[in-house]
Amino acid sequence: GATVFGSMIRDSYIHYMMSYGGEDFIDVDTGKCNFNSQSFMDMLEYAKTLPREDSRDDGVDYDYYENQYRENRTLLYDLNISNLKDCMYQIKGYMGEEVSFVGFPTSDSNGSVLSAGNVFFALSAKSENMEGAWQFARQFLTPEYQTSEELYNMPVLKSAFLDKAQEATQRPYWTDENGNREYYDDTWTVNGETVILEPFTQEEVDRICQFIYTVDRTAYYNEEIINIIKEEAEAFFADQKSVQEVVDIIQSRAQIYVDENR
């Protein structure tokens, strides 16, 4: 039968659970924790059904792994939309059909998040050089930078974002020494056969953009909190403590940690 997350193990699920749903359990504004909730208990109950370690050996059948979504063996795919071009490979390559953007299971059924990527900046409210700091950060928000080739990931300037999205409706090309465009096709391998991936239609691009506009969560990540969860959940996974006992301990430890570090 089909699995929800494929070969995902417990630790990976806990990382996803906090990255996508961490705001359900920690209010980043007030510092109030909510780990002794029914939704968190439900997530630990599900995590218990997952394997502790990946049972696959080193000789993984690459085609078998790549085709798990096309063959309906795995239901959910962790789609990372850094730009619509890469998104096309994931949707038309891995999935091979129209998809639904459902997000990770969260309390408000809206478990998709915005991530700042590898580089992000914060301006200290106590800075003595706020204007200089702002001018430095501002350069990355200007139309010149947002439309430049330096920016590989998704632009935050809407006009630049829409222009970039439009590229996903066009066939890829490279430019020869005479400045002429040489077009080619994106391809994917399915069961040893090469298939052509057609560019997105305008309707498909519009649908993806509309989904992106609805995302209003940011990814949550705190290694200390995740370690607390993993450490204490082991007793539940090993049937040494009930899920209620474990979440009460997690709630206490997490709240102390948050209070001490605010």
What residue ranges belong to the model's regions?
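Extracytoplasmic/periplasmic solute-binding protein
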Residues: 1-33, 72-76
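Bilobed periplasmic-binding protein-like "clamshell/Venus-flytrap" ligand-binding domains
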Residues: 1-9, 143-155, 256-262
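Glycine-centered hinge/linker elements that transmit conformational signals in sensory
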Residues: 29-62, 99-100, 104
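Non-transmembrane alpha-helical segments in soluble domains
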Residues: 41-51, 66, 124, 133-142, ...
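Extracytoplasmic/periplasmic substrate-recognition and gating elements
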Residues: 52, 91-169, 213
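Short helices/loops that flank or line small-molecule/ion binding pockets
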Residues: 62-77, 82, 89, 231, ...
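Long, aromatic- and glycine/proline-rich binding clefts that accommodate carbohydrate-like moieties
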Residues: 102, 151-235
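Conserved N-terminal structural module of periplasmic/extracytoplasmic solute-binding proteins
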Residues: 195, 217-219, 231, 240-262
